[in-house]
Amino acid sequence: MCAVPPPHISITGLGYLGLPLAQKFYQHSSRVAAIKRSLTSDDINLPIHLDTFDLGSSDAFQTALWRHHADKPVWFFLLPPSSLTHYADTVKQWAELARACNVQHLIFTSSTSVYGDTARECDETATPDPQTESARQILATEQYLLDSGVPNIDILRLGGLYCAERHPVSRLVQKQNIQGGNRPINIVHRNIAVESLFQTAFNPGGRRLKNIIEPRHPTRREFFTEEAAKLDLPAPDFAPDDSRGKIIRTVCDNGLSL
């Protein structure tokens, strides 16, 4: 158990990260409210308050819909850009609502994709270079949050997520002649990401940015071949190449103060 009781929380996005995070907070006696688009059979017996509605609807941010969230001092936003048509604008509205509810701490899962694909070493001081529309939306969202007026903002840029139940190697082994096998990989196990989110909620510290990645950086070929063996899958078919890629690090355990 934690020495200090965890805060009560609101989670927007009760999925791959949100569900284990909600369960972890509940197990530590935190009151949890969450939002997702639709209810599944797995959600029925969750010991949390769960609201279901579409964040893209015109009335999604009416205060009445968030009455079970308004008293929670920490709000998480865990949805990726693929889940929303107008991602940055939606997160901006979420942050504006949080400020209106006097929420003191927002925690947002960003992505290391904002650094682009150029071969270089990146920590939180590196200049972003988003190459995809998704990465550009994420970077715009970060700025909206920093400008929101909420006193404590944590932006966690996650590396590529993986775990045994939902592993990217399961898709890779279905392909042939995969490119980029020699590029270093920037990954983070889901358990590490969940623990990082959990610990961040205990320590608000103004506006902060942190990369959440594992310290090891094997090549894509090395990592996915090893992971395939663990899951009793055939080795992925990587094409020979000498391509290079970025390596992502973090400046310190607490990230970069902004």
Residue map of PLM features:
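NAD(P)-cofactor binding segment of oxidoreductase domains
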Residues: 72-108, 140
